[in-house]
Amino acid sequence: MPGIVLIGAQWGDEGKGKATDLIGTKVDYVARFNGGNNAGHTVVVGDESYALHLLPSGIISPNTTPVIGNGVVVDPEVLFQEIDGLESRGVDCSRLLVSESAHIIAPYHRVLDKVTERFLGKHKIGTTGRGIGPAYADKINRVGIRVHDLFNAEHLHDKVEASLHQKNQMLVKLYNRRPIDVDETTDELLKLGERLKPYVANTSLVLNKALDEGKTVLFEGGQATMLDVDHGTYPFVTSSNPTAGGACTGTGVGPTKITRVVGVSKAYVTRVGEGPFPTELFGEEGEWLRAQGHEYGVTTGRPRRCGWFDAVVNRYAAQVNGLTDIVLTKLDVLTGLKEIPLCVAYDVNGERRDDMPTDQAEFAAAKPIYESMPGWDEDISQVHDFNDLPKTCQDYVKRLEELSGCRISVIGTGPQRDHIIQINSLID
């Protein structure tokens, strides 16, 4: 009955797609439990590269059942685009299961997301503009539309009308936009529902039954710990819980069925969008890391902000997620550096802090306290045994492990699927 949770331990883009695909070939189900198509991950198989946004990474593994859980907000149009794109490349998507209780991103959610972000100006959050936040807001305000609502025309019309009543007032009076038509929106959603219906299931029941039968389920989180609405750098966060606890609420599986929690971290740190980032690099160093790591968002194409490894962030991620293992990715990107700084603590207004400040004013004022380690020049992409890594590279990994307080079980040494060093198995 292994239930394995896989989460990002930083601000996202850590390489969860590669880690999920590594584990996903050995599991029976891969379930997304939060977020929507604002999460981008790339899976590389041989010469093929698959950019996924809404679908679980396990869709690439033919013997795995991919599941979109109730905690995900689903944009049907994006889902179908992604399915069509994969099927045109020979990937079978008929195995996909979508929770009947998942909330829908309607066209008006995307409109509201974009006009609100523009209206905020310099106070913007840095959203992807894909309607994620407004859809989650409707969920909390109890005016959201769920997947099963798409199959009852009269019921759906009533729900759309209720949802648009206040939104149209805002669009017209606050944002000087035209109101959204209730009938047109209902008809559009009904058509999307017709195509979605074959994939819809009671996924909580499916996953619990699978675990009770001794099958292995991988719970895949979108975004990452530092973007969690409760535990991240609020307000510069996403609208859901990408931390390990979200795996339970986002799939309807109880915590006693979780046996492993795996955090994915880069050997350095990146962030997209607004918000504090203590180890952020500017100038030539930041440009070098961005170029070496090809650091551009899968979902947005935006250049990622880059910085040195932050052990305070990783310790915090280990704490709030209860990490049992770390997958360290993109270690190869650091090849060629003579010295590699890593952040071991913060200076906050003259005081050393080894823990994560929860006050965002303090976190914004945090200055990294660095220690420096010698780098390496050797190509490590073909190394498959930890002991065959350059000594200075081994020392760097061991120091990250020591500072994070959690064992590093897998190391990514390049972009390909087989560019890994597996120290410990991630499946019991």
Curated annotation (Swiss-Prot):
* Keyword Chaperone set for record: no
In terms of superkingdom, the source organism counts as Bacteria
Disulfide links within the chain: none
Q: Where is the active site?
A: D13, H41
Binding site residues for Mg(2+): D13, G40
Spell out the coiled coil positions from the record.
none
Chief site of localization: cytoplasm
Instruction: Please list the residues that bind IMP.
Output: D13, E14, G15, K16, N38, A39, G40, H41, T128, R142, Q223, T238, R302
What does the UniProt keyword field contain?
Answer: Cytoplasm, GTP-binding, Ligase, Magnesium, Metal-binding, Nucleotide-binding, Purine biosynthesis
- Pfam families the record matches: Adenylsucc_synt
Q: In which pathway does it act?
A: Purine metabolism; AMP biosynthesis via de novo pathway; AMP from IMP: step 1/2
**UniProt cofactor note:** Binds 1 Mg(2+) ion per subunit.
- Reactions catalysed: IMP + L-aspartate + GTP = N(6)-(1,2-dicarboxyethyl)-AMP + GDP + phosphate + 2 H(+)
Query: Where does it localize?
Result: Cytoplasm
GO cellular component: a single term = cytoplasm
Q: Which GO terms describe its biological process?
A: 'de novo' AMP biosynthetic process; IMP metabolic process
Recall the GO molecular function terms of this protein's record. adenylosuccinate synthase activity; GTP binding; magnesium ion binding
Q: SMART domains from the entry?
A: Adenylsucc_synt
**Record-annotated residues binding substrate?**
V298, T299, T300, G301, R302, P303, R304
Q: Which cofactor does it need?
A: Mg(2+)
Q: What's its EC?
A: 6.3.4.4
Provide the function of this protein.
Answer: Plays an important role in the de novo pathway of purine nucleotide biosynthesis. Catalyzes the first committed step in the biosynthesis of AMP from IMP.
Q: How does it assemble?
A: Homodimer.
Q: Which family does it belong to?
A: Belongs to the adenylosuccinate synthetase family.
* Protein name as annotated: Adenylosuccinate synthetase
Q: Which gene encodes it?
A: purA
